[in-house]
C-alpha cells in the first residue's frame, strides 16, 4: 500500500491563498494571479529569496492561524497518514521587513530577526497540526531560527539540514537536490528537455540516504521530487521519472553493500523491455555520451567523452554526416577541426545502436569552451 503525505506549503508559495483572501498577507490589496510570470529572484545561490510579488502569509496576523486551523482540520480528515507537510521553503520575506505588524510582533515576542519570525510561525503551525492528532514535517528551512519541538525535517538543500536535525533528535527524510531531483536533465542539454541542471542516472544510484554519524533510526527514508513547472504532459512526466525512480527505489530498499551499478544496469534494461511492451515512456539517456568541452591555446576546442554504461563504443563525425558503427571510435580527447560543421555522436554495443544521435553545433561547442 501507499501512504499519501499531503503538503500545504506555508508561509511561502501561498499566492492562491492570499489572492483569495488578501487580508492574510502583509500587503492586503487586489492580487492578480498570472501563472508563468516571474514572481521571485534567487540572489546568493538560492539560499535567500526576494519576492517580486508577495506570495506569503503574514505571521503577525491572527486570522492566518484561524484560516490554517480550518485548512489542516480538513486535511487531517481526508488523509489518514500520520504526517502532514507544512512546506516552509522558499519564503520571500522582504515584504515582512516593511510591515508594522511584523515589527510589533518582533518586539512583543522578542524575535531578533526574520529567521526567528518564521520559526515563530512554524512553531504555531506545528501546534495546530499536532492538535489534529498528526505529526508535522517541513522542508529544511524550518531549521532556521529554531526548529519546532516535535517537527520532522525533509532535507532538500543537500544533506546537512537532515544531519543537523537528526543530531538534534528529530526524524528526517533525505531529499537532496544533488541526487533525487528528477525534474533535472538526465543527459546532455543538446538532446534533453531544457532545465537548469543535470542529474544522471548513475548519480542518482550513488545516493546514500544514511549519513555517517547520525542515529539511523531517525532517518525515516528518502524522497525523489518531480516538480512539473517545466513538465508539460504525462508522457514528459514518464520520461523524467523512468529510469531514475528505479534507482531511487533500489537505493532505499537495499543496504549500501548490496548496491552495484554494473548489476543495476541489466535490471534497468529488463524494465525497459516491460515499459516498451506497456508503452510507458522512459529516458534512454544512460546510453548517450557524457560530453566535456574545454579549450587549449585560447582557440582550440577539446572534447572529452565518456559513458555511464560500460561496454559502449562512441562513434563520431565532424563533417555533418550521421555516424554509425563504421565511423571512427572515440579513444582519446578530440581536437575539433576548425572547419567542422558540427560534432555528431552515437553509441553502439557491438553492431547495435544504443544511444541517440546527438548533434552539438560549432556555436554550442565554442560557447561551452568559453571561446567567442
Where on the chain are the PLM-derived regions?
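Short, compositionally stereotyped local motifs that mark structural "simplifiers"
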Residues: 255, 259-372
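An acidic- and aromatic-residue-enriched active-site/binding cleft used to recognize and process polar
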Residues: 2, 7-13, 89-91, 141-144, ...
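Generic recognition of stable, solvent-exposed alpha-helical segments in well-folded globular domains
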Residues: 52, 59, 63-71, 116-124, ...
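Flexible, acidic glycine-rich loops studded with aromatic residues
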Residues: 135-151, 157-301
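Substrate-binding cleft of carbohydrate-active enzyme catalytic domains
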Residues: 1-134
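Short, solvent-exposed loop/turn and secondary-structure capping segments
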Residues: 9, 15-20, 96-98, 164-165, ...
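Structured core elements
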Residues: 3-7, 56-58, 83-87, 137-138, ...
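Domain-scale activation on soluble regions of proteins
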Residues: 3, 15, 58, 192, ...
Amino acid at each position: 500500500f501507499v501512504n499519501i503525505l499531503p503538503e500545504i506549503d506555508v508561509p511561502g508559495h501561498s499566492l492562491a491563498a492570499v489572492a483569495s483572501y488578501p487580508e492574510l498577507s502583509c500587503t492586503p490589496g487586489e492580487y492578480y494571479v498570472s501563472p508563468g510570470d516571474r514572481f521571485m529572484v534567487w540572489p546568493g545561490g538560492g539560499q535567500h529569496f526576494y519576492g517580486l510579488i508577495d506570495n506569503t502569509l503574514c505571521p503577525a496576523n491572527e486570522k492566518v492561524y484561524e484560516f490554517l486551523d480550518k485548512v489542516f482540520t480538513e486535511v487531517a480528515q481526508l488523509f489518514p497518514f500520520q504526517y502532514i507537510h507544512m512546506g516552509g521553503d522558499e519564503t520571500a520575506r522582504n515584504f515582512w521587513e516593511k510591515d508594522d505588524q511584523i515589527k510589533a510582533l518582533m518586539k512583543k515576542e522578542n524575535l531578533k530577526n526574520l529567521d526567528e519570525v518564521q520559526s515563530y510561525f512554524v512553531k504555531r503551525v506545528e501546534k495546530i497540526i499536532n492538535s489534529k492528532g498528526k505529526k508535522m514535517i517541513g522542508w529544511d528551512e524550518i531549521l532556521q531560527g529554531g526548529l519546532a519541538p516535535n517537527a520532522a525535517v525533509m532535507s532538500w538543500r543537500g544533506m546537512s539540514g537532515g544531519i543537523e536535525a537528526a543530531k538534534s533528535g528529530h526524524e528526517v527524510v533525505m531529499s537532496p537536490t544533488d541526487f533525487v531531483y528528477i525534474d533535472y536533465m538526465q543527459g546532455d542539454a543538446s538532446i534533453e528537455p531544457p532545465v537548469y541542471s543535470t542529474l544522471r542516472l548513475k548519480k542518482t544510484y550513488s545516493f546514500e540516504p544514511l549519513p555517517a554519524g547520525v542515529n539511523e533510526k531517525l532517518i525515516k527514508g528518502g524522497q525523489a521530487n518531480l516538480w512539473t513547472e517545466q513538465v508539460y504532459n504525462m508522457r514528459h512526466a514518464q520520461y523524467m521519472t523512468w529510469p531514475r525512480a528505479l534507482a531511487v527505489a533500489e537505493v532505499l530498499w537495499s543496504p549500501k553493500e548490496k548496491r552495484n551499478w554494473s548489476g543495476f544496469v541489466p535490471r534497468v534494461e529488463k524494465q525497459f523491455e516491460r515499459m516498451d511492451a506497456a508503452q510507458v515512456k522512459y529516458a534512454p539517456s544512460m546510453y548517450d555520451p557524457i560530453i566535456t568541452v574545454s579549450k587549449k591555446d585560447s582557440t582550440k576546442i577539446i572534447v572529452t567523452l565518456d559513458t555511464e554504461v560500460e561496454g559502449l563504443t562512441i562513434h563520431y563525425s565532424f563533417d555533418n554526416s550521421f555516424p554509425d558503427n563504421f565511423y571512427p571510435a572515440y579513444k582519446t580527447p578530440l581536437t575539433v577541426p576548425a572547419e567542422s560543421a558540427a560534432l555528431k555522436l552515437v553509441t553502439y554495443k557491438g553492431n547495435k545502436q544504443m544511444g541517440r544521435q546527438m548533434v552539438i553545433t560549432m556555436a554550442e561547442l565554442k560557447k561551452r569552451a568559453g571561446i567567442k
